[in-house]
Amino acid sequence: MVLDKVNNMSNNKQRPIGVFDSGVGGLTNVRALMERLPMENIVYFGDTARVPYGVKSRATIETFTAQIVEFLLQNDVKALVIACNTIAAVAGQKVRAMAGNMPVLDVITAGAEAALATTRTNHIGVMATSTTVNSNAYARAIHSRNPDVRVQSQACPLLVPLVEEGWLDHEVTRLTAREYLKPLLADDIDTLVLGCTHYPLLKPLLKAEAPGITLVDSALTTAEAAAQAALQAAWSPARKAPE
């Protein structure tokens, strides 16, 4: 019996981490995870066939999410990382219900905590998809930790298609981002949460358009949360380090 338990723990440690997003944006999370947990295996699902999610109905997002989670569970993952803000905002509870006791990490929780740790003026801006903004998920997550913080959210529905197109430094993307940033900058924010995993790919452009504003990339904080979960669950490296 003890030997079986030891074998099961060993097998569990060798299983991969499942990461999923509506498209290529979640690869920013994968990169951060690989840097923070270099010995872990990762299974990534990017739903490029049905991107963008941010303009779809709640029911559609929940259906697509259930299909993705089922696929990852069939691949015997040991933890799930919701690398899509829209999914985290709309279907996070569904993911956790399907996962059971499995650790589930999401970018909104990590992003909210990072923003609160970063802001000096308690004026935080959030750029996100329309669905994420309408869900009020970031404001709720931030206010649950500090109700005195002012949160200004801006829907940016055109940015995901531009990133998926590869127009990371295109003039059209620059002009579009500039328009989205105007109300946020007018609100005198000092911290800006990139509330979609596609947006970190635009960091050079956004830094140029919003100088002096600290950008919060939730991919980095999500990776740190995964590392803490790995420590608590005593995950072992899934691969041997190169000699």
Model-inferred region functions:
Residues V2-E243:
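Non-catalytic structural scaffold of enzyme domains
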